[in-house]
Amino acid sequence: MEMQQNCSISCFWETQPLGCVKISCIFYHSKPRNINGLFLPPSSNIILQKETQEGIPPPTQSQEPLKPQENISRPIHHPLVLKTNFEEEEEEEGEQNDASSLWTKTPEEIEEKRAIKEMCYKSGEYYRVHTPSDISSSKSIASIVEKEIEKSLESGSELQEGDGLTVPTKFSLFERQGEIKASLDRKPRTDIAAFENGGGDCYVPQRIIFLGVDENEVLTEEKESTISKCSNAKVNDVHPVMKPHFKGVKKRKWIYDEPKNFPEPGMQRVQASNPKNKMSYHRNNKNKNSENASYIHVQRDAVRTVSLNAPPHGRPPHGSYNKADVNKEPKFKLCSDKYMSTSYNGSAWQKRIPFSKTYSKNEKIYTEPRRNGSK
């Protein structure tokens, strides 16, 4: 009924210059219409009534609601299909890898994998977080090791040559006390004597190797020299400092039993070149060393008297001592003189030091001091 009523009403857009443009316009049209090349005749009531009775819906109304449904349903299915394909491909690749691993495995590869696992396990134990129980156990082990080291230091049995705490095993305890001087400040000494003796902790074995003489003779002489040093400790100004509970060997101060300096360069060279003469010199003067003071103070006094009593212009410039050298220790002044290369002034030293003797008979001995211009 509504459709019939609408068909009786004329269309409003027909009065407009463009006319009605709607294809599915329900209102009555008295004029024909041309819409995008489609010709539509004027509407009649009979045709409209038949169409309404048959129940044929207009094509535009039925097609429009179906299109959005199709557009919505299409994008939902595609991603599902793609996902299933990827999963299947991954499963196939995994199966192929398993099959290849079963075929390619050899006993060598299996052993390598086991070794790698063991290494990883050990490294994990090393780098893992330590619990307080582990720390306490490690401390107990460290304390046991320290106690064992202290016992070995007290006994002195496990000490070897080359360590910083070496003790010469050939000497007795009394001789060790004479040789080893402990220092409380624990600071290293950089004396000239350490460099002259070749450095190191135990200079006596090093001097034996350097001279290349019999060890028994040197040891006997060193024993007597150490005994004389212990008796004349005030002269050397170095006292042995030993604790009652002495653990280990501490650093020692150097006691230099040999003369540090020589007034003549020829005397230094002769003594360095003839070690056997040096040993004979020590043998002849054993008793005098024990009675008199140490070599150092005797030679210092002799050098001071020589430097004070020497004529200012009578001695050559390379062998003289200036006034500034009176308060200082005498220093070596090496020269390239052909007369002073292999000789020394023996008679002058015999007068000044009564217990000094010549080193060898083959060397020339000048009885008189040489003057400037003398041959």
Swiss-Prot record:
One Pfam entry for this protein is DUF5571
Q: What residue stretch is flagged as signal peptide?
A: none
Q: Where is this region: Disordered?
A: 54-78
Q: Which GO terms describe its biological process?
A: poly(A)+ mRNA export from nucleus
Output the InterPro entries linked to this UniProt entry. DUF5571, Znf-CCCH_3
Protein's recorded name: Uncharacterized protein C12orf50 homolog
Lineage of the organism = Eukaryota, Metazoa, Chordata, Craniata, Vertebrata
